[in-house]
């Protein structure tokens, strides 16, 4: 079977509970950002120090870099989806097996070489003071293919979500250059719209017409699951952690289930009946928009 391409849509109903998935031991207290880059496609922060262990990991995996993804609008921008729900953005933390391999370049040649942690970003009404430390560095890398020292004290632990239960599956890096095991925290961290919009002002490496282009979006759409791909989760409370406000009443749950059905039809027919697949994905987008607007209204009512 071919390797499962990343990203994917995680269907919580089909995820398999695995009691052997112990909590991760995250040791970012000694991690220090060294440089921040505008690659022309994304924002990358390189790190020195920091590692993860525990969980299902055979040994320590050291932190290499952080990548950030976003979309044109605040309501979509994540690579991975949870029950067809897209978050505002996504952070990927790339780690490599230092105990077994001599370098990152060597590690990525092997199926046990890379571990990527995914953290979702969700736009809210309040600024994230820890995420702001990254935003403050963006003016120094506004042009494509530029790099600058990360000149602020930054503690990566502060960007971890409040709940560290996780999904995991075997896939690839986002650019499909290497195999990778994914650890996905379904509980997002909150940021402000103004913070996310700053990323859309970065210049892209695309310059085919001689005019400046901006990285208005860089997320990837999900790939269909292979028949043998298994998604596992680490605990029962994960289902509660992935529940969005759009599922807090019967009608919204019904809309969400209908959206999932349409998305499954899209995945089923994309290789055959493309017309039917297009109709299905259009319904997915429409239902997603309705759920988003109803979710926003629910949040405002709850605050009031």
From Swiss-Prot:
The chain crosses the membrane at residues 276-294. Gene3D superfamilies: Alpha carbonic anhydrase. InterPro entries: CA_dom (IPR001148), CA_dom_sf (IPR036398), Carbonic_anhydrase_a-class (IPR023561). This is Cell surface-binding protein OPG105. Keywords: Disulfide bond, Host-virus interaction, Membrane, Transmembrane, Transmembrane helix, Viral attachment to host cell, Viral envelope protein, Virion, Virus entry into host cell. Coiled coil: none annotated. The keyword Disulfide bond applies. One of its GO terms (cellular component) is virion membrane. The gene is OPG105. Homodimer; disulfide-linked. Belongs to the alpha-carbonic anhydrase family. Residues 1-275 are virion surface. Binds to chondroitin sulfate on the cell surface to provide virion attachment to target cell. It is found in: Virion membrane. Induction: Expressed in the late phase of the viral replicative cycle. PANTHER family: CARBONIC ANHYDRASE (PTHR18952), CARBONIC ANHYDRASE 7 (PTHR18952:SF124). One of its GO terms (biological process) is virion attachment to host cell. Residues 295-304 are intravirion. One of its GO terms (molecular function) is carbonate dehydratase activity. Apparently non-glycosylated. Residues 1-235 form the Alpha-carbonic anhydrase domain.
